Amino acid sequence: MSDYEEDTRPPPNIETADPEDTIKILLATDNHIGYLERDPIRGQDSINTFREILQLAVKNEVDFILLAGDLFHENKPSRDCLYQTLALLREYTLGDKPIQVELLSDPDEGKAAGFSFPAINYEDPNFNISIPVFSIHGNHDDPQGPGVNGALCALDVLSVSGLLNYMGKFDLPTSDADAATTGIAVRPVLLRKGSTKLGMYGVGNVKDQRMHFELRSNRVRMYMPKDKDEWFNILLVHQNRVKHGPQEYVPEGMFDDSVDLVVWGHEHDCRIIPEPVAGKNYYITQPGSSVATSLADGEAIEKHVALLEIKGKEFQLTPIPLRTVRPFVISEVVLEDAAEEEGLDVNDQMEITKYLKQKVNDLIDQAQALWEERNARSIEAGDEEIPPMLPLVRLKVDTTNVTQTSNPIRFGQEFQGRVANPRDLLVFHRSKKAGKRGAGKVDIDQPELSIDDPDLTVSEKLAKVRVKTLVREYLAAQELQLLGENGMSDAIQMFVEKDDIHAIQTHVNKSLKTMLKNIKSDEVDEDDLDDLLAKAKQRQEEEYLEATRAGESAKGKGKAKATDDDGGAASDDSMLMDIDTGGGATFNMSDDDDDDEPPPPPKRRAATSRATTTKKAPAKAPAKKATTTTARGRGKKAAPPSSDDEVIELDDDEDEISEEEVVAKPVKRTSRAAVLSQSQAPAKKAPAKKKTPARQTQTQLSFAPAGRSSRAAASKARSKMVFDDDDDDDD
């Protein structure tokens, strides 16, 4: 709530009433005429309530009606909507009743350009106005469109017809140069009745960011008479009162101290009792809408208009409930709580439907009781009884941890003829925040991150921000059961930093596929499945960490290298594979690799020698056999987390090949190794590669000194070629 609630000032009141000096005003806002006008049930709700407001003005013999925006729901009201509005204004605002408020300001201020009639309708001798209506525009009926006469709105039409006085319209600067020096100029409508002087300052709806800027910059200029302390000043605004963003609202304490009362439009919940503002002399009244345009909690508050009486610098406000507003009740149920408290079976859809029907029936009975109570008050006050109306009912259903739910539209069909909104009777939703699992555990949605340390300065926090670190901490809070946190972290980093859109999907698919293969081969019982998965995940994590640190894991050496670009044991080869633009040596991604631990010295530079070693002629035949073992090793090693999607694709193909089948084709594999070993740089163009053409491009990345056995070197060169080619395919 706002700070004004701390103000202990008593409600405003007029000590001695004097009709000759008291200005009586009927306050209303957000009528939204035309809302759901095509709905067969609710189509006439807004116009019926507007008719009641005009009738209340006549009944209470007010001096005029004051509206704070959104008279129409649509920016371009329909012909039928305009017809009914004009007819009602003519019916209730024209007549022989004399106007007792004197206009002191210029009657031509704001009049239609090029015409002689005044802006204030009761100053026109051709009209016989009994109750003037003053209104500003809202965000629904604001001026739009360029034209000869500038931007126009529906209120301009009512104004030139002589049935309404449009105020609060101003032109904003059209150029940046003018915007720097020109603000919002608010010119008042000055009225007097007896000894009471009233100044009305209307500010039609402006985008909240712009209004916030103008107020912060003190660029809202209110033109006031010289003896401003003798005037009672009312300010009409139509802006966000609730904070929706840093600048998407208007602070309550931003208005001038000379204002006595702020009439706030746009907010639909009724807070019509004047509320003081801490540190300010003025009060705020928020009449709220006269028709429910959304089935929200704020709309369920009883709708009111107000009778405002002003004498000198004193005022008092009397709320008047609206009888023609359709009754609206709203409630919420949590199925999970109902299961605990009432024994509801959340797995039985029929039982859930029966439970929800009972809740809706209770709400209908509640709405009926509300309607009867309202009618009883009206009859006591001497008003006519209003025929019953179908109520608006909204039941919000929290379906967290519930899988069986009803169809909302089909559910509402059973209440056809009993409620006014059968199609949106139910609204299903789930809780956004998960409950705490216990003390000491990290919250899933808001884990304790290392950058949240209160002892760190802003610069230190920014310096510690790393994708790898943040992802790892979030994944730790999720408590993954199948995927390893390290491998998933690397896959996400590949996705973020290197635009590898398939990294995450490929890593997940590969890990799950390998795990399923292991489970099928072991043929374990379902009771032991969780333990097996936990052990498999732990084994994957251990192998992954070992591979990333050593870079020479016997089973998944190439795969570990391909995904190890996060620092730690990352080698120069891994940088080449990750970028893959032909000039891998020119890339330096180590800036992002300083997250958690400093990388060890580049002792594995010898790894680049593996491809060069393939030049040796005796290494051809052994290279084929070594390659076969390496391929199968990569297939089994697919379970450790990885971010190299192409490697997974190649491994999937090789996993289906048995060892005997691979050995049965030693000649072709040996010939490819020979071609690669004899022509390193030109091998990129070698067309002889038909089965795995991507491997041909690896020759340009094959460079290293000799110093290892031809068998091992050829095997590692082959493994290195596969992963480098995968990066090429990804680009």
UniProtKB/Swiss-Prot annotation:
Q: Which organism is it from?
A: Coprinopsis cinerea (strain Okayama-7 / 130 / ATCC MYA-4618 / FGSC 9003) (Inky cap fungus)
The cross-references to CDD domains, in alphabetical order and at most eight, read:
MPP_Mre11_N
Q: Which GO terms describe its biological process?
A: double-strand break repair via homologous recombination; double-strand break repair via nonhomologous end joining; meiotic DNA double-strand break formation; mitochondrial double-strand break repair via homologous recombination; mitotic G2 DNA damage checkpoint signaling; mitotic intra-S DNA damage checkpoint signaling; telomere maintenance
Q: Which PANTHER family match?
A: DOUBLE-STRAND BREAK REPAIR PROTEIN MRE11 (PTHR10139:SF1)
Protein keywords: Chromosome, DNA damage, DNA repair, Endonuclease, Exonuclease, Hydrolase, Manganese, Meiosis, Metal-binding, Nuclease, Nucleus, Telomere
**Entry-linked InterPro entries:** Calcineurin-like_PHP_ApaH, Metallo-depent_PP-like, Mre11, Mre11_capping_dom, Mre11_DNA-bd, Mre11_N
Give the taxonomic lineage as stored in the record.
Eukaryota, Fungi, Dikarya, Basidiomycota, Agaricomycotina
Q: Which proteins does it associate with, and in what oligomeric form? A: Component of the MRN complex composed of two heterodimers RAD50 and MRE11 associated with a single NBS1.
Tell me which cofactor or cofactors this protein depends on.
Answer: Mn(2+)
* Coiled-coil positions: none
Sites where the protein binds Mn(2+) 1: 30, 32, 70, 268
According to the record, the residues making up region (Disordered) are 543-731
Q: In what ranges is there compositional bias, type Low complexity?
A: 608-632
Similarity comment: family membership: Belongs to the MRE11/RAD32 family.
Question: Could you name the active-site residues?
Answer: 140
One Gene Ontology cellular component term attached to this UniProt record is: Mre11 complex
What role does it play?
Core component of the MRN complex, which plays a central role in double-strand break (DSB) repair, DNA recombination, maintenance of telomere integrity and meiosis. The MRN complex is involved in the repair of DNA double-strand breaks (DSBs) via homologous recombination (HR), an error-free mechanism which primarily occurs during S and G2 phases. The complex (1) mediates the end resection of damaged DNA, which generates proper single-stranded DNA, a key initial steps in HR, and is (2) required for the recruitment of other repair factors and efficient activation of ATM and ATR upon DNA damage.
Main location, first listed in the record:
nucleus
**Record localization:** Nucleus; Chromosome, Telomere; Chromosome
Q: Which GO terms describe its molecular function?
A: 3'-5'-DNA exonuclease activity; manganese ion binding; single-stranded DNA endodeoxyribonuclease activity
Which Pfam families does this chain map to? Metallophos, Mre11_DNA_bind
Give start-end positions of Acidic residues composition bias: 643-661
Output this protein's name: Double-strand break repair protein MRE11
